[in-house]
Amino acid sequence: LYFCTRYKHQMSSLPEKRIVDFISEHHVLTLATSFEEEPWCASCFYVYMPEDNCFVFTSDFNTRHIQQASHNIYVAGNIVLETSVVGKVQGVQFQGIISQPQNEQYEKAKKAYLKRFPVAMLMDTHIWVVDVTYIKMTDNRLGFGKKLIWSKDIALQK
């Protein structure tokens, strides 16, 4: 672990519990995509699978963010706690790689998503996952501007 005055940086297979707990307590993320110098953001209902460190969400093929992701799999996003109290500000910014899960991963992701959002059973949509590679969490409850940073060892992906 690397420490400095405002940042705590961790490089391991999974983020620390405070980050996982924050992500797990929420259900809407903003997903940012881009292609040919055209950025886009989309709000997505998600479920987080901490054991795989990935977000699961549904979206149709014809949406702008999925169209862009089909050309550029590198995405970013955020999850934020809305509050006007500066001392309670919390949020996560992340980077990751988007894909359609296959086989066992698909079944696991679908089961997790439908458990959290059973109404999705009524919709004709597609499951997507974002394999998280970087997280920066701001948590002012730990001190103003306190950041917790996690990075995936990219060598593990190869």
Predicted segments, located by residue:
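Short secondary-structure boundary/capping segments
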Residues: V20-D21, V47, Q67, P118-A120
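Short beta-strand segments
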Residues: H26-F61, A69, V75-L81, Q90
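Alpha-helix boundary recognition
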Residues: I23-S24, S70-H71, L114
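Short acidic (Asp/Glu) patches
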Residues: S59-T63, A76-L81, E107-V119
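Short solvent-exposed loop/turn micro-motifs enriched in small/polar/acidic residues
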Residues: S24, P39, A120-M123
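Generic structural signal for secondary-structure transition and capping sites
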Residues: H27-V28, Y74, P118, I135
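Extreme N-terminal tail/first-helix region
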Residues: Y2-V28, A155-K158
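Charged, gly/pro-rich active-site loop segments
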Residues: V86-K158
